[in-house]
Regions:
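Inter-helical turn/loop segments and adjacent helix faces that build the functional surface
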Residues: 119-127, 164, 187-196, 276-283, ...
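Contiguous, non-catalytic segments that form substrate-binding/exosite surfaces or channel walls
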Residues: 107-257, 451
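All-alpha helical catalytic cores of prenyl diphosphate-utilizing isoprenoid enzymes
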Residues: 174, 178, 205-209, 215, ...
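Post-HExxH zinc-binding segment in Zn-dependent metallohydrolases
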Residues: 286-326
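A well-structured
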Residues: 1-163, 465, 490-499
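Divalent metal-coordination and catalytic microenvironments
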Residues: 8, 148, 264, 297, ...
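C-terminal, non-catalytic "cap/extension" segments appended to globular domains
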Residues: 2-4, 20-23, 36, 40, ...
Length: 499
């Protein structure tokens, strides 16, 4: 190992330690921090973010990156370390253009905006959140202009969350999917609806937490390097190598919400936990492709978790932990988790209509950054698009524009990744069945860990060594297409609804 590489790794360790402190503070803010501690913790977030920013834009760091980019050094590095140097040099050059005071203000404002969103959602009042959102939008535009002054802001944001992706490709794939979804939804809407009255009862939230532990263990989440807590909005975060955490939210009148949030977040966490240890402390362990990440969470949640055969080996175990389910026939539960109908809340939408929720958000984000729609006009635009795409209109802001936290922390460009992930899943399904055989049989026999192992070997262990297009080509041998997902929907729901 060269002296330059040793110096770089020592420097990188300092940056990672700041990132760990910031991640831990955010975890605490979302899960346990008392109300009166919020401003102090936000101040700490600002401090650590500023120190991290200073380190990541220091001339010493840039000098190390440039030395390691020289052929005599670069050619001696591992592929993962080469990726680290390329990506970090790119980010260094971008961040070097951002004034330190602006960066500190931006980070602090996003954290403050998250708390304003929580208050606005609780009050179902967009006006409480609007000034914060307006400022985050404005500062996000400024943030991008500092880094890449000649690039379209929204194009940059999409690429930030899904490396190598562009809006032209997304427009094409989403149009392909939308063309197939709308007539399928019409056929489902015309079919008889199942009787789900057995689920109209109260389910103990504490017992739901035990069910979550059962499900996480069943699909392969390791509690030796993971933890679970409660938050307003379920999420997954990696604090450091060997520490991947998930949260959930529990509703007494809707246990299916926490069940599938557990499986969804578990899919995210398993991906992070399964990254090869040789990649720790490199850019490969920092999975920066959210579509690829969402493909894992949504594969577990939908392709596996909504398959009736997934539940055959564990339904009785779940009922023992959550006794109310003993009064819910297995067939009724299966119909409930595959019930398709337009709904207000994205995170509770079925897998068919979910894509339309994402298309709505994608179109609004493009309107924000390309059409300069006014922040105060966003609730009306949201409601208009809900009616156009799903045929329903929110009764209030909480079940409308305030339902997601993403915009509060500046995560514009993230939403398309959810639907991209589902599109990738249709392709994974076909590849898995070629290697492991019929999925129904694998699940019926309780071989869920065989699937987790397949995903680990094909996808998880590489982290972000390859972008999503490269992963699809390596795993599936094809370019990205929505057709496999549409075939999956058509085959599955023609059986469920008998058309």
């Amino acid at each position: 190992m060269s002296q330059t590489l040793e110096q770089f790794q020592a420097y990188q360790t300092r940056l990672e330690q700041y990132d760990q402190a910031i991640a831990l503070l955010y975890w605490d803010l979302q899960t346990a921090a008392p109300k009166d501690s919020i401003e102090a913790k936000l101040s700490a977030v600002g401090y650590f973010s500023t120190e991290s920013f200073r380190l990541s834009t220091a001339d010493e760091y840039g000098s190390l990156l440039k030395k390691l980019s020289a052929p005599e050094e670069y050619d001696q590095l591992s592929p993962a370390m080469q990726l680290t140097i390329r990506r970090n040099l790119r980010d260094f050059e971008r961040f070097k253009r951002i004034p330190e005071a602006f960066y500190t203000e931006y980070v602090t404002e996003k954290a403050r905006s998250e708390k304003a969103w929580e208050a606005a959602k609780e009050a179902s009042d967009f006006s409480v959140f609007a000034p914060h959102l307006d400022k985050v939008i404005s500062m996000t535009k400024e943030y991008v202009h500092y880094m890449e002054p000649d690039q379209d802001v929204y194009e940059f944001l999409v690429g930030l969350f899904e490396d190598g992706m562009d809006t032209e490709t997304i427009d094409r794939i989403f149009a392909e999917l939308k063309e197939g979804l709308l007539p399928l939804l019409a056929k489902i809407e015309a079919a008889p609806k199942p009787d789900l009255s057995a689920l109209q009862q109260t389910f103990d939230p504490d017992a739901q937490k035990k069910v979550q532990e059962l499900l996480l263990s069943y699909i392969g989440f390791s509690f030796d390097c993971g933890a679970v807590a409660e938050s307003m909005h379920p999420f997954t975060t990696t604090l450091c190598p060997g520490d991947v955490r998930v949260t959930n939210h529990y509703y007494a009148d809707n246990p299916i919400s926490s069940i599938f949030s557990a499986i969804h977040e578990g899919g995210h966490a398993i991906f992070e936990q399964n990254v090869d240890k040789d990649f720790w402390h490199t850019a490969a362990a920092q999975i920066n492709m959210m579509g690829l990440h969402e493909s894992q969470s949504r594969f577990y949640e939908n392709i596996l978790g909504r398959n009736p055969h997934f539940w055959t080996p564990i339904y009785e175990k779940m009922s023992a932990l959550l006794p109310e389910f003993k009064t819910v026939p297995f067939d009724t539960f299966i119909k409930a988790i595959n019930d398709v109908h337009p709904s207000m809340i994205r995170t509770e939408a079925d897998e068919v209509t979910y894509g339309l929720h994402i298309i709505l958000r994608y179109e609004i984000e493009k309107a924000i950054f390309r059409d300069n729609v006014k922040t105060d006009d966003l609730p009306a635009l949201w409601n208009q698009k809900m009616q156009e795409l799903l045929g329903i209109t929110p009764a209030n802001d909480a079940e409308g524009i305030l339902q997601d936290m993403h915009w509060s922390d500046g995560s514009f460009g993230y939403f398309p990744s959810y639907l991209l992930g589902s599109i990738y899943d249709g392709m994974y399904l076909e590849a898995i069945q070629k290697d492991l055989g019929d999925l129904d049989t694998v699940l019926e026999n309780g071989r869920i860990l065989d699937i987790t192992h397949w995903l680990k070997e094909k996808i998880h262990r590489f982290g972000s060594m390859y972008n999503s297009k490269e992963v699809i080509e390596r795993v599936c041998g094809k370019e990205i297409s929505a057709q496999p997902l549409l075939r999956y929907f058509e085959e599955k729901y023609s059986k469920v609804y008998g058309f």
